[in-house]
């Protein structure tokens, strides 16, 4: 009887798995923002090879070299709180961008001019600057790094 019940439930399980599984491999916009821009510890951000290591580690050198990226070295909660700070217009003209009320510790990574894929070579520069992020969702969280000021 237990086997019979299992055989009846198996097709339902397969159907459910097929419905849920595709979303398992998909990264949300908020998760992508965190992968590409958050490094709260930032322990080796003062190293000249920081950007080379982090860009590779965070999958931004697969297939091509991402030309520019910024890492934020602040707690995630502090960066998420920017979504309730000063509303500003995004570079693309949308109205869902917000500017941090204070300067944050960031590292800018710029692809060096002579660098070619697959040997992505970045210049690492540290700053204390305000940042602008685009926010979406419920809860309202950063999904795009728009600029520094």
UniProtKB/Swiss-Prot annotation:
UniProt signal peptide: 1-25
EC number: 4.6.1.18
Tissue expression from the record: Pancreas.
PROSITE patterns, per the entry: RNASE_PANCREATIC
Catalysed reactions, as listed in the record: an [RNA] containing cytidine + H2O = an [RNA]-3'-cytidine-3'-phosphate + a 5'-hydroxy-ribonucleotide-3'-[RNA]; an [RNA] containing uridine + H2O = an [RNA]-3'-uridine-3'-phosphate + a 5'-hydroxy-ribonucleotide-3'-[RNA]
Main location: secreted
Subcellular location: Secreted
Pfam families attached to this UniProt entry: RnaseA
Renumbered residue ranges of the record's region Disordered: 30-49
Protein purpose: Endonuclease that catalyzes the cleavage of RNA on the 3' side of pyrimidine nucleotides. Acts on single-stranded and double-stranded RNA.
Protein name: Ribonuclease pancreatic
Organism (species): Mus saxicola
GN (gene name): Rnase1
């Amino acid at each position: 009887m237990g086997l019979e019940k299992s055989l009846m439930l198996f097709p339902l399980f397969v159907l459910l798995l097929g419905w849920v599984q595709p979303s398992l491999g998909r990264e949300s916009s908020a998760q992508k923002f965190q992968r590409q821009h958050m490094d709260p510890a930032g322990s080796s951000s003062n190293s000249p090879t920081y950007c080379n290591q982090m860009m590779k580690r965070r999958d931004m050198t697969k297939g091509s070299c991402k030309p520019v990226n910024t890492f934020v070295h602040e707690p995630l909660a502090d960066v998420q709180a920017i979504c309730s700070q000063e509303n500003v217009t995004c570079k693309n003209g949308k109205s869902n961008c917000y500017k941090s009320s204070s300067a944050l510790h960031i590292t800018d990574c710029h692809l060096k001019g002579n660098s070619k894929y697959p040997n992505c070579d970045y210049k690492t520069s540290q700053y204390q600057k305000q940042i602008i992020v685009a926010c979406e969702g419920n809860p309202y969280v950063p999904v795009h790094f728009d600029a520094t000021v």
